[in-house]
Amino acid sequence: MQHRASERRSIQGWVPQVSILRPGIRSLPGIGCFVFAAVLQCGFVLSAQTAAQAWLKYRPIGKPLSVPTRVSTLGQSLLEQTAAIELRRGLLYLSGSTPLAAGPNTILLGTVQEMRARQPKTTLPTLEPDEFLISAKHGDLTREVDITGGSDRAILYGVFTLLRNLAQGIDLGEAVIRERPAMPIRWVDEWDNADGSIERGYAGRSIFFDDGHVREDLAPVAEYARLLASTGINGCNLNNVNNAAVFLTPQMLEGVARIAEAMRPYGVRVSLSVDIASPQKIGGIATFDPLDPAVKKWWANKVDEIYALIPDFSGFTVKADSEGQPGPASFGRTPADAANTLAAALAPHNGVVLYRAFVYNHHLDWRDPKADRARAAYDIFHPLDGKFASNVIIQTKEGPIDFQAREPVSPLFGGLTQTSQAMELQITQEYTGQQRHLVYLAPMWKQVLDFDMRVNGASTPVKQIVAGKSFHRDLGGIVGVSGIGQQAWLGSPLALANLYAFGRLAWDPNLTPEQIAEEWTRQTISTNPAVVRTVTRMLMQSWPAYESYTGPLGLQTLTDITGSHYGPNIESSENNGWGQWHRADHDGVGMDRTVATGTGFVGQYSPDVAKNYESASTTPDNLLLFFHHVPYTYKLHDGKTVIQYLYDSHYDGAPQAAQFVDDWKSLKGRIDSELYADMLPRLQYQAGHAIVWRDAVTQYFLKLSGIPDQQGRAGHYPNRLEAEDARLTAYRVIDVNPWEDASHGKAVYCGPAPDRSPQPAPDGSALPAPDRSALPAPDGSALPAADRSAQPSPNGSAQPAPVGSAQPAPVGSAQPAPVGSALPPPAQPTPDGSALPAPDGNAQPAADGSALPALDGSAQPAPVGSALQGSASSLKGTGFSPYKNSQEKKRALAPEGDQSCTADFAYKGKAGRFKIAVQYFDLQGGAAKFTLSLNGQQPNSDASWSADATLPTPHPHADNSTRHIIHNIALKSGDTIRISANPDATDPAALDYIEILPATP
């Protein structure tokens, strides 16, 4: 597969330029001229817009505008000038460059004070600082639209609101629009590192930092601030909460001041994550005890230094005593002690501290049935309620674990009535597909915002708590971990719907996710009603689909939690100290968090909420396994057993992912051709990866429980030919780890199998060796446990578990069976249905007399949802090599001459037209080449492709298992299907299986 253009390029064409004239000023700058002065001299001409403008890529609406096109401002502030520029630019593009109107027709911009001074007889309401009023006045020959703001920033918000309506084809008419944000803190957090990498970022490198300093070119930063301001976001925390001390050095602060200057024209104020140990690490003080007078003085001096450079600096974000980050607990101090020391330094400058409640012990004893990571935030912070300074906000994750596809609302929201709180959510899709999967997160966030905590028996929805309204707090808000980078902001065009939705919900949490999706689609893609319906439907169905084919019923993530957090590795969350356990065994699954028999977590909620979660019978099915350990035969509210729901959910979810491909194809010719071509392979990849998820989870629970799927699908693949059963030339059979990540636990590998012995980490320390203890399977054999050796995330920023933290397997635990041992077929026969060819297990002779696996054409039904399409499509990343050093890699995969491997299969089914799915592993560090031939001939151009996507994990794994489809293949009994492969560097052209599927249009 070739790289898409959007993957190869950084964001370019940041700013369209328009010629603008207004009385009294000869020319006004384009927004790209982000360093503003009192009189600015960078005039410019109209130019084409690019995809970098996202939802601000204004297109002609095809009809006369309902507002004047002459703009006048009453003030000369930086933000008012920005507002005027934005409005002129938007009107020009929306009108298709219609000449500016002459005469008295005007859009007038001003603050309340400025408007009152101009129109002393006009009654204007008192507006809050970020509140605006849009009103229209009509006379016989005149028309005036006033945008009045409680501040100059509010004027800018009013301008973006007017343009949002016009871009959607909504006429202003005689309407009066008055809006104010629901909460004061509306920030994005960037987890950017000084070297330019981004923790949990999936869109390339940082737009802020590179090689230990602030980037020279900050035009992307100005354009990002423009996007943020257009949805009402008013703050940006620039750097990673881990390893943050360097950002307080004088050289770095001078660079941060340049970033602040770039964002200032849009009213976006910057803040920094700080390391609580900075006084010791960079200040030369022997301690970082927050109550030490020298430490307090150091922080006060450092804050003064910052404000001398950045007068509108917002404050600090703190991660402490968590996941290896230092904190006040080192000195017997509390989070309140640390937060208040910082708050005292910031208070004279009106700065704030956002102290993250993400504090927990990642060395929990998994054998202890009372141990529970979910309890940590409440246990630590609830006793400190009322002890924090007034300018401290506790930043609480939406759920008690860590940005899962579904988890309950954090009980801490109801546990702090005398302390300001902000909700932390994640725009970057760490556990929800990493922007390789379409997952629109607004419905999830909306459920959290609307959830009623029932504090003291009264209605207290989370949105009111974080807005400061429930408990009469002046501060509060929402913080979104953004992860934007140089590749199309979030890496995938449709992922930008999440950034847009975050801003809109932070401004108005009463908006519906569907309403926001429609707004975004009209502004970004098309106002065509059919397009809006289709894209909105895709967005709204994407989160339920993802949850369905990954981890339903409150299982939390089943991703590889000690590695990439991406593909399935179910055992990785068990038997270690990280506390994301689902407690699955032969008899049942789920974590008992009840007060009566479990960890007591349920008791952290108010009584009105706790009573619903304490009993399995009253717990919503979608959270059942988060709160309760139940037998696989436990019946849900619809009468279906837990195990059957797990099977059905995955077999229902995968076809939903495939439907996104068909939905998108229906838009061809109706939307921008570049956007169409960019998204199609991404959606095809998702459809294929949904099958990988489906198979891994259903195989795992089939073997663990011993209870077959009532429909005979799990572990039974009648249309597949396994690569390890093919006639192989140069390929070698390997075990895949974890075993459920391959169709039957094995794959073939073109080159020597990698040495997976522990390798040194980048810092020179040793990575923990895999824990290969085993769990007993129902048939008495052993299930292989997860390989818990630490692997980097796609951006290389993974934090391996500390050496020695792994818990040993219990004495007497079963010895592991070979990883990838084949699964037996289900006990029940599969019902007769279609006449698709199925394997009969009989070897067919190849041309040289050796045996080939065959399809005999016996009548077997295709697995529900098996006819899915997929192809590789993802973003570049980095990772550890499976080889000890570059010399071993060169010897193994790049011997002299071209290395090639082949796998031959025989077809002995009914004649007809089919499509062939090839499931292979696309490893980092190279681009292996594959060719499918039929009887020695390549059937079409799709039958040759490159494995040139970059996916996590450097050895064959569900993270990089990828599906390629060759359509419209005529097969007859006796045909030979050959897969020829050429490895490249560290990509060994690993192959899992081929699957013969019914042809589709």
Features from the language model and the residues they span:
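Bacterial N-terminal signal peptides
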Residues: 31-43
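Acidic, contiguous N-terminal accessory segments
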Residues: 48-138, 173
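Extracytoplasmic
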Residues: 711-755, 857, 863-865, 870, ...
